């Protein structure tokens, strides 16, 4: 049986070119196997050699057209995706865009996803008790007067707006009529509010037209009484032995501050919010995970390295950029590459106006003019040094 120090020195000696993470993982696995099988020095060396061989086989060849391969590898399975799917992992109450529209949404780096949602995990105190989980959900769920109303009526004779509040919904929300009245009075100075049991009467102080009353009634109905802005309803589900909250709508920055929320595991499907709150590395990981989860949802397998390449290109500059004419492609230095993608004539006119020069260093521009592309063997520039002809000795006179 070899010692752990011998294993470490053998890894350092043989695997000089291996990344540190691979070396560390190899060391941990060898220590474990050594304790179990009592390996000899020759066996350890054989395992290390095999790992190095497999690692070298996994490396991409210099000059490989990785962009083209990634585009094909992601694009081909995407054609098998459904065009519209609106369900989410068993949470039937929450609609979430899946399938091809979601992939397009991610690579376009849309500021606001069509169906934003958060998965909120709870801390040790709240995650095992449903009542405590509901307490946290109430803090998060955005509640408006419209959510609590049983009926709403516009009384055009008395110029009043009457709201019948549902007692059950009111109790569930954790609000009271007094709290609602106080909140509305502080927010709307141009109106008077009166509560009679579960009936709320809104009277504008100064009114000239019926349209003014309608406008005020809409504002009062939509006014947020509690919860986070941008968040609609919440759903509590039991996963394993803990309760998890799913939200319709997203406010990632604020939800992390809510007491009872576990900020280390809570996530959103809004990539830009992740970039703003947690930074660009987290946004890169979110892009990878979102694309992979969307693919898996449809039963499709794509090698993660293709998706990692896309995520790397999108987050290269420290901000999340779309792949398209407003992002990665639109910022290419080559005029011909930009023109080949979209709005050809405009790109060519603008380039001519500015007197731009194309150095023909990329793939697209060389394809356009019929030159060998700088990919694979085309990357190599061969030069040849010809032997100089020996000078004839001057003939003696």
Curated annotation (Swiss-Prot):
Q: Which UniProt keywords apply?
A: Cytoplasm, DNA-binding, DNA-directed RNA polymerase, Nucleotidyltransferase, Transcription, Transferase
In alphabetical order, the GO MF annotations are: DNA binding; DNA-directed RNA polymerase activity
Which SUPFAM superfamilies does this chain map to? beta and beta-prime subunits of DNA dependent RNA-polymerase (SSF64484)
Q: Please indicate if the UniProt record lists Methyltransferase as a keyword.
A: no
Q: Which Pfam families match?
A: RNA_pol_Rpb1_5
Q: Does Iron appear among the keywords? A: no
Complex formation: Part of the RNA polymerase complex.
Name of this protein? DNA-directed RNA polymerase subunit Rpo1C
Q: Which organism is it from?
A: Pyrococcus horikoshii (strain ATCC 700860 / DSM 12428 / JCM 9974 / NBRC 100139 / OT-3)
């Amino acid at each position: 049986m070899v010692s752990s120090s011998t294993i470490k020195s053998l890894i350092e000696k043989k695997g000089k070119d291996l990344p540190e993470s691979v070396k560390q993982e190899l060391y941990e696995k060898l220590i474990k196997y050594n304790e179990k099988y009592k390996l000899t020095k020759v066996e350890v060396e054989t395992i290390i050699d095999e790992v190095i061989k497999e690692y070298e086989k996994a490396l991409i060849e210099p000059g490989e057209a990785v962009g083209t391969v990634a585009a094909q590898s992601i694009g081909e399975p995407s054609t098998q995706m459904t065009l519209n799917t609106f369900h989410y992992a068993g949470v039937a109450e929450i609609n979430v865009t899946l399938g091809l529209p979601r992939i397009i949404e991610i690579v376009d780096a849309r500021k606001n996803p069509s169906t934003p949602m958060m998965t909120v995990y709870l801390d040790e105190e709240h995650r095992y008790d449903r009542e405590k989980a509901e307490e946290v959900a109430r803090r998060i769920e955005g509640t408006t007067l419209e959510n609590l109303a049983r009926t709403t009526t516009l009384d055009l004779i008395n110029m009043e707006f009457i709201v019948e509040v549902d007692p059950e919904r009111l109790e569930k929300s954790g609000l009271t009529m007094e709290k609602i009245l106080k909140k509305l009075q502080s927010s709307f100075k141009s109106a008077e509010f009166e509560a009679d049991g579960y009936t709320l009467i809104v009277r504008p102080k100064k009114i000239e037209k019926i349209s003014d009353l309608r406008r005020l009634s809409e504002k009062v109905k939509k006014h947020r009484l509690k919860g986070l802005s941008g968040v609609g309803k919440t759903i509590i589900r039991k996963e394993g032995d803990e309760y998890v909250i799913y939200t319709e709508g997203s406010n990632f920055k604020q939800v992390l501050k809510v007491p009872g929320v576990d900020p280390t595991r809570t996530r959103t499907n809004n990539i830009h919010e992740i970039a703003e709150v947690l930074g660009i590395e987290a946004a890169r990981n979110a892009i990878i995970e979102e694309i992979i989860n969307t693919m898996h949802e449809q039963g499709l397998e794509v090698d993660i390295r293709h998706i990692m390449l896309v995520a790397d290109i999108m987050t290269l500059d420290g901000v999340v950029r779309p792949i398209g004419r407003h992002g990665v492609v639109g910022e290419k230095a080559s005029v011909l590459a930009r023109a080949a993608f979209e709005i050809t004539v405009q790109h060519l006119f603008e380039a001519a106006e500015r007197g731009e020069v194309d150095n023909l260093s990329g793939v697209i521009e060389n394809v356009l003019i019929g030159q060998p592309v700088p990919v694979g063997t085309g990357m190599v520039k061969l030069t040849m040094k010809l032997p100089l002809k020996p000078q004839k000795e001057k003939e003696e006179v």
